[in-house]
């Protein structure tokens, strides 16, 4: 039961990071997203899909603030986790694949 409570706390933290982003507080979203990921890595199994969601969201936050290298790293990690834990047709897998392709293109154009 405690693990479920801790997992729920991670989801709430991730939701707070998303809310910051929705409000245009992108630096706050990035900080909260990093805290969320750190927390989830302590309390969840290594390839838990919630960790993938946090990586996905952090990728978006990094991209918004202009850190394309980290954005691509987080997007790739999200994709790796989703491919390891979800069926290939799951929307998270598709969204992460699209994000990786987009960020690879952005990174190549910036080089």
Predicted regions and their residues:
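Intrinsic-disorder-linked linear interaction elements in eukaryotic regulatory proteins
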Residues: 1-111
């Amino acid at each position: 039961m405690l693990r479920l409570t801790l997992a729920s706390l991670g989801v709430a933290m991730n939701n707070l990071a998303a809310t910051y982003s929705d409000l245009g507080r992108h630096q706050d979203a990035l900080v909260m997203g990093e805290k969320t990921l750190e927390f989830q890595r302590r309390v969840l199994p290594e390839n838990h899909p919630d960790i993938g969601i946090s990586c996905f969201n952090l990728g978006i936050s990094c991209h918004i603030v202009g850190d394309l290298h980290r954005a691509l790293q987080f997007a790739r990690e999200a994709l790796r986790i989703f491919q390891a834990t979800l069926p290939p047709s799951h929307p998270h897998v598709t969204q992460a694949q699209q994000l990786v392709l987009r960020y690879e293109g952005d990174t190549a154009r910036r080089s």
